[in-house]
């Protein structure tokens, strides 16, 4: 670790002040074991560019192992677990890790939005290849104002724009690449999407974040359309001034250009690609106003070409140019929750152990279910505040494509409770279409979700009640958890790890949502378990029992409860528990959506209304109205499509909309001609049975060499223009196909190769339906070949495989 002295210490919400801090150095850090407690004025600077609150706390508390006087454990943004720490000391250290100021501001945003837009939108793919012609990017009605206005009206506090995805296409006219809007026909090559989004964000008071993909396939040294690409070109590391003069980028990178107004230049010793990346970062961070988040994706679409990312230089530049910005993903400030479904863990700790100091830690994805329990906090670990961000697209995919279905408002509401309500920051992606507009089907579901959430939390039914606790710190009474201020809080009495708080309301209230928030910004995350009880007039009834709270925990019940007394029992805590706020809420009264069935093997779909209400539906992609077709019997959808349905209340109100997308032809009369391997209880026929919950699985203990093939006879010729692959939906990656070949035939011989060597980009993180278009052909037979799986076992699995009808077929 690198220590640099400072005259003073950092105060959380104020200026520097002189102070002494007690610190014990770790015994395994090349420090003499006889070294005693030092009382020094010190600050800790690491290459991430962070300034950390001190002290770093080492040693044992409350009782030192060798009988020395206990070392006080202070609040800090980092703690270190030494080999002689007791379990009590470890718990206390974890409870005294605090978020940094940029994290506090970010966590309080709660509802934030992604926007994915670029050449992929026009090509109907999730991952581009860097070989796209910039002329493909030509939106006809691009309106960034519409995007940001929709975000603002939906309760969004920040928009994170994908400024450059893996294809390397820049949505701003960068000085350092020809693969950008400047070489596209849009706005005559004079357009700048980043500028238009930044202006709209400023107009609507929405914070701005930027996504810049570390992987850049346009700059790949093996890209034939850019043979002089920087990525993986094994160039020498040279002294480079950022921003670099584009004219001398390769020949003399120490020659800088004029810095942006109000900013200065920086010098790093880096190779060509890192110099290129730093210059693009510099443009984004100096020309578009304040940046709240910098989003680094961990995906690498072509790992065959190696490039070392100089994260230390990247972080240093960000901290200097936009010190308030969060660095997400491959960075020290916020982590990916581990899925692309927007779902947080039921036990979500914001304090996590690092195996090395933040100075050298590589910030890998943390996808295990348990990443922060006390059992994970072991000797040699550094404890660090690292909150979760949950991301999910409103479509079943990140970029718009004509057939991608939209998530219903009901599903989005569920995700809200499982993201924001599970100690996470929610990042919901919107996907403008080829016009450059967010389509109505996305907006309709987004607005309904926001309406329900906003109406639900408009009134806290606990306000006006009296909150008491069976024990309290003298300075932190229970009433402070009902004052609407996250910077005041109730805290249990010293030494207490459990508590019981009772809320007595002036009159009975009916509610079905409970909100709890710890004082994480001042006291860290502590609560390990709690229960909620309701009084029925004669006894207490347990309504719910959960684990962590953190910044926010939301409990939503299927049935409301009416009572005038509520009890919160905190049954486990790492240190004296705290509550900054609590609330009781009643969900907005809306008619619940009907249930749309899966499509059966004959291509039929049924719709069920639990309360027997009439149901209306559409098949043309529009949201139903009370005048839409009334559901009376099973709907035939043999060639695929999307069903939208809603119940109609007795007063004529339309309920929440349900939707379900059915891709490809129904497997009517299909049969498996051959499969080179199959488990007896997971036969190949399960890949064409219309049931997403069954799978074809190759043998687990034999036939362990790829490729594996499945050949299907569709019974009659069809005009098709693509195929679909649904990976297994049980959460396992066993046999999930990553690389494939797809072939078709009219007679079962003389095969045509439609896709020779395709790849399902991002399938490891996104188990949604994969659609692969190709030029229309006539075929009766198709053959799917798995070339590579996500694992290394030589297996293949599939929930469903189908084909996409060509336009003429779809209209039959």
Regions found by a protein language model. Name each.
Residues 1-40:
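N-terminal secretory signal peptides that target proteins for export/translocation
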Residues 43-55:
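Bacterial N-terminal signal peptides
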Residues 61-483, 488-497, 503, 515-517, ...:
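Mature catalytic domains of secreted/periplasmic carbohydrate-active enzymes
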Residues 120-126, 399-401, 475-478, 625-626, ...:
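Short, solvent-exposed loop/turn elements at domain surfaces
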Residues 587-709:
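Short, compositionally stereotyped local motifs that mark structural "simplifiers"
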């Amino acid at each position: 670790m690198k220590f640099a002295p400072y005259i003073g210490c950092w105060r959380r919400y104020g200026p520097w002040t002189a102070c002494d801090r007690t610190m014990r150095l770790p015994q395994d850090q090349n420090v003499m074991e006889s070294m005693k407690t030092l009382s020094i004025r010190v600050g800790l600077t690491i290459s991430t560019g962070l300034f950390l609150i001190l002290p770093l706390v080492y040693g044992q508390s409350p009782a030192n192992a060798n009988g020395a006087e206990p070392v006080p454990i202070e609040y800090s943004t980092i703690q270190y677990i030494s080999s002689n720490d007791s379990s009590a000391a470890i718990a206390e250290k974890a409870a005294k890790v605090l978020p940094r100021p940029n994290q506090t501001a970010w966590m309080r945003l709660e509802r934030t939005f992604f926007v994915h837009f670029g050449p992929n939108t026009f090509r109907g793919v999730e991952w581009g290849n860097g070989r796209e012609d910039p002329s493909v990017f030509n939106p006809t009605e691009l309106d960034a104002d519409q995007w940001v206005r929709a975000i603002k009206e939906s309760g969004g506090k920040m928009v994170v724009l994908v400024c450059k995805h893996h294809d390397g296409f820049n949505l701003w006219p960068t000085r350092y690449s020809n693969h950008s809007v400047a070489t596209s026909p849009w706005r005559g090559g004079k357009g700048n999407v980043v500028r238009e989004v930044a202006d709209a964000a400023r107009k609507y008071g929405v914070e701005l974040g930027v996504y810049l993909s570390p992987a850049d396939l346009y700059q790949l040294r093996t890209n034939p359309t850019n043979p002089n690409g920087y990525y993986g070109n094994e160039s020498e590391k040279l002294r480079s001034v950022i921003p670099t003069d584009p004219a001398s980028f390769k020949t003399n990178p120490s020659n800088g250009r004029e810095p942006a107004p109000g900013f200065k230049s920086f010098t790093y010793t880096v190779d060509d690609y890192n110099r290129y990346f730093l210059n693009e970062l510099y443009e984004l961070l100096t020309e578009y106003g304040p940046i709240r988040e910098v989003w680094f994706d961990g995906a690498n679409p072509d790992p065959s070409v190696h490039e070392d990312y100089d994260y230390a230089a990247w972080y240093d530049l960000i901290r200097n140019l936009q010190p308030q910005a969060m660095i997400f993903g491959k960075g020290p400030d916020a982590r990916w929750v581990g899925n692309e479904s927007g779902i947080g863990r039921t036990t979500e700790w914001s304090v996590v152990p690092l195996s090395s100091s933040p100075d050298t830690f590589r910030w890998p994805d943390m996808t295990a279910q348990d990443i922060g329990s006390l059992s994970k906090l072991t000797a040699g670990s550094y404890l660090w505040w690292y909150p979760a961000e949950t991301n999910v697209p409103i479509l079943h995919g990140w970029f718009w494509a004509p057939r991608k279905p939209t998530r219903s408002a009901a599903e989005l509401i569920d995700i809200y409770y499982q993201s924001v309500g599970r100690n996470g920051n929610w990042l919901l992606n919107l996907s403008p279409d080829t016009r450059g507009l967010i389509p109505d089907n996305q907006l309709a579901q987004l607005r309904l979700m926001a309406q329900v959430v906003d109406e639900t939390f408009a009134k806290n039914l606990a306000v006006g009640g009296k909150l008491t606790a069976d024990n309290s710190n003298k300075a932190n009474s229970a009433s402070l958890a009902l004052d609407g201020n996250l910077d005041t809080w109730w805290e249990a009495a010293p030494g207490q790890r459990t508590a019981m708080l009772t809320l007595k309301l002036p009159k009975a209230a009916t509610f079905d949502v409970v909100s709890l928030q710890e004082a994480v910004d001042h006291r860290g995350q502590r609560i390990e378990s709690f229960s909620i009880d309701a009084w029925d007039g004669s006894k207490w009834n347990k309504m719910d029992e959960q684990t962590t709270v953190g910044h926010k925990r939301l409990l939503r019940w299927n049935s409301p409860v009416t009572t005038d007394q509520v009890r919160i029992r905190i049954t486990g805590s790492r240190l004296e528990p705290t509550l900054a706020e609590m609330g009781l809420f009643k969900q907005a009264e809306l008619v619940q959506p009907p249930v749309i069935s899966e499509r059966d093997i004959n291509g039929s779909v049924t719709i069920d209304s639990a309360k027997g209400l009439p149901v209306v539906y559409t098949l043309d992609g529009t949201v139903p109205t009370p005048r839409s077709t009334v559901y009376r019997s099973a709907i035939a959808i043999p060639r695929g499509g999307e069903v939208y349905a809603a119940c109609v209340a007795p007063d004529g109100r339309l309920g929440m909309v349900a939707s379900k997308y059915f891709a490809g032809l129904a497997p009517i009369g299909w049969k498996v001609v051959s499969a080179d391997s199959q488990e007896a209880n997971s036969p190949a026929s399960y890949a064409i049975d219309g049931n997403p919950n069954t799978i074809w699985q190759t043998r687990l203990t034999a036939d362990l060499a790829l490729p594996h093939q499945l050949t299907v006879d569709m019974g009659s010729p069809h005009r098709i223009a693509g195929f679909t692959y649904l990976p297994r939906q049980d959460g396992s990656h066993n046999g999930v196909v990553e690389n494939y070949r797809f072939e078709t035939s009219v007679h079962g011989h003389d095969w045509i190769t439609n896709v020779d060597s395709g790849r399902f980009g991002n399938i490891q993180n996104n188990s949604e339906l994969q659609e692969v278009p190709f030029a229309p052909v006539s075929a009766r037979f198709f053959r799917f070949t798995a070339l590579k799986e996500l694992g290394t076992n030589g297996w293949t699995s599939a929930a469903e495989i189908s084909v996409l009808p060509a336009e003429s077929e779809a209209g039959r």
